[in-house]
Regions:
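Extracellular/periplasmic ligand-binding regions of membrane signal-transduction receptors
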Residues: 31-74, 109-116
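Short N-terminal helix-loop-first-beta-strand/juxtamembrane motif that initiates sensory/input modules
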Residues: 36-55, 81-102, 139-141
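Conserved beta-strands of PAS-like sensory domains
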Residues: 67-73, 148-173
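Short acidic/glycine-enriched loop/turn segments that link adjacent beta-strands
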Residues: 101, 145-149
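Extracytoplasmic/periplasmic sensor domains and loops in membrane signaling proteins
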Residues: 75-89, 106-146
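Hydrophobic helical h-region of N-terminal Sec-dependent signal peptides
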Residues: 8-17
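N-terminal secretory signal peptides that target proteins for export/translocation
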Residues: 1-9
Length: 173
């Protein structure tokens, strides 16, 4: 019996050592993926031109300002966010500021029914909104539609440096 307990103890210690090595490496890999995806999302939109709001658009029955980069409409258009995810994995979203809310207008984030989560709003009481309202980025864990993600949220600023939307990338934990 003592030999059996010793073997179990050695195996348990080995598992702890391996997990203490692997878990930080997984977290670092996720952080690197988030940074890489955000850089890709920003680069793809910058190539299109300066961000601006123009007119009104309907997103899942909500009227919101139209989000453009240069002459390219982003509202209800998924090419850019889908390209970022195809290249890097994870999820990507563009939010537009509509009053006090930030509304998903281009995303590959899916709701429980499998539909894109366009028209849903950023949690107005969550940790992200406080940083965005200060014009700052948020990097860290966030609950998105009830699921934990490692995320990066960066303000989208117009030519006058006003925050008009948010870039988002994230990876499920």
């Amino acid at each position: 019996m003592n030999l059996k307990n010793a073997i179990v103890g050695i195996l348990a210690a080995g598992c702890l050592i391996v997990s203490s090595i692997l878990i930080p490496n997984v977290a670092n890999a996720q952080a690197d993926n988030v940074k890489k995806s955000m850089a890709a999302l920003i680069a793809k939109t910058e190539k299109l031109g300066a961000p601006k709001l123009e007119g009104k658009e309907s997103v899942s029955g909500k009227e919101v300002p139209g989000l453009y980069f240069g002459k390219t409409k982003m509202t209800n258009v998924f090419d850019v966010v889908d390209e970022v995810v195809k290249e890097n994995g994870g999820t990507a979203t563009l939010f537009v500021k509509a009053g006090d809310d930030y509304v998903r207008v281009a995303t590959n984030m899916k709701k429980d029914d499998g539909q894109r989560a366009i028209g849903t709003i950023l949690d107005p009481k969550g940790p992200v909104i406080a940083k965005i309202k200060k014009g700052e980025a948020f990097y860290g864990e966030a609950d998105i539609l009830g699921k934990p993600y490692v995320t990066d949220y960066e303000p989208i600023r117009d030519a006058s440096k006003n925050t008009i939307g948010i870039f988002f990338v994230g990876y499920a934990k």
